[in-house]
């Protein structure tokens, strides 16, 4: 698995989720399974089967988070140069076909929130913008087809994930 770039915020958020799953959710589901098991016949015990399914989901998520954290590359976007589009950069682009402007900030895939302008570095838009500078024009394939964009500005701003 390749390294996964993320901010310290993203790393801490994943650590908190992992801790919660291991220390709260996993013990809780073990108790639920024991209670369901005490109700008798396991073949037709929907409560037991639901709890086992939930346990499998929790264990899979614990494994997934463990892998993500093991492969995490924590990056402080403020420490990077932002003369070209890179991780943590904010970029203002102009759709040359529609004359609409957009501002995006490139973050890790686990931190993305497109409605807040936070897009994953692995998204098609981010991939097309990476390494480009102000004034560059890029062609990006979107669901509605090929679109031409001009990069108006590349800058750094503090990334606000919540609130």
From Swiss-Prot:
InterPro entries the UniProt entry points to: GreA/GreB_C_sf (IPR036953), TF_GreA/GreB_CS (IPR018151), Tscrpt_elong_fac_GreA (IPR006359), Tscrpt_elong_fac_GreA/B (IPR028624), Tscrpt_elong_fac_GreA/B_C (IPR001437), Tscrpt_elong_fac_GreA/B_fam (IPR023459), Tscrpt_elong_fac_GreA/B_N (IPR022691), Tscrpt_elong_fac_GreA/B_N_sf (IPR036805)
Coiled-coil segments on the chain, per record: 45-65
Keywords (A to Z) from UniProt: Coiled coil, DNA-binding, Transcription, Transcription regulation
Record's keyword annotation contains Coiled coil: yes
A molecular function GO annotation: RNA polymerase binding
GO terms classed as biological process: DNA-templated transcription elongation; regulation of DNA-templated transcription elongation
One Pfam family per UniProt: GreA_GreB
NCBIfam families assigned to the protein according to its UniProt record, in alphabetical order: greA (TIGR01462), PRK00226.1-2 (NF001261), PRK00226.1-4 (NF001263), PRK00226.1-5 (NF001264)
Function according to Swiss-Prot or TrEMBL: Necessary for efficient RNA polymerase transcription elongation past template-encoded arresting sites. The arresting sites in DNA have the property of trapping a certain fraction of elongating RNA polymerases that pass through, resulting in locked ternary complexes. Cleavage of the nascent transcript by cleavage factors such as GreA or GreB allows the resumption of elongation from the new 3'terminus. GreA releases sequences of 2 to 3 nucleotides.
PANTHER family: TRANSCRIPTION ELONGATION FACTOR GREA
Family: Belongs to the GreA/GreB family.
Protein's recorded name: Transcription elongation factor GreA
